[in-house]
């Protein structure tokens, strides 16, 4: 799959933009602050249904009242149009010109993998950031996972509301706990199953790219189990603690994902370079997983890759990503090695040429 055409209206510093893209490796270059990352952001918005770096109201171009993003996606010879329109009155998504009830109905129509310079700091920060990264990836590849996640979040919201009540809600909590256990067990199973596959891919890739010295393990740390009856019993045991804290404290919404190299936790002992390398391997493994398991190659978006790695590492990474993606976007401040790209786009003040 690849982005055939992108159209923007009042998005960030783009007043109006219409650009066609080719498959393959695309260089987007220009000075800092001209709109390179904004272009990447717009494409990835249609992958995850929101910005990866700001709230919707901050994306509207100064002086405008709304923004629009539209894209034509080519996949196996078929064309699909996706879009989003946002104003202070609300937001809605479109597929082939038809309004959708929610973003979940179009999630997966454009699969994508993103890497930005800020991601290692964010990813290795709070556990919620790592859960979010894993959930966004799995939701793209499995409709069942997405539905279980949606149902789990709805039940969790109801349970948290009950835990804040002053009257006796024990019977109601038990009913919600059983539903949490049911959906939670499926979420945990899918996360563990996926990470087992990703671990093999990560180590195969590292053997060739040599980013990190030794065996790498992405380890899933769960507060429960992957069996709904066991989770239900755990939730019953922890009810008093949850009632005291007035929030749900156990389940996949509190689980974590840690990276180890030769048994050492990268979050604690890893250098910034090692964290960057581990996260890139994780991202690359996602592209491989999508291509092999789901049968659809994602669009890859690499923001400011040139400032992060030397030429040898860059070329190796680009080659691997291109092997498992039909389209790779790379942003840079300088037009380096132009002959190596299928398309080159220059950006200045929100204008492309």
Curated annotation (Swiss-Prot):
Pfam families: SMC_N. ATP binds at residues 30-37. The keyword Protein biosynthesis does not apply. The keyword DNA repair applies. One of its GO terms (cellular component) is cytoplasm. InterPro entries: DNA-binding_RecF, P-loop_NTPase, RecF/RecN/SMC_N, RecF_2. Keywords: ATP-binding, Cytoplasm, DNA damage, DNA repair, DNA replication, DNA-binding, Nucleotide-binding, SOS response. It comes from the Bacteria. One of its GO terms (biological process) is SOS response. It is found in: Cytoplasm. Belongs to the RecF family. This is DNA replication and repair protein RecF.
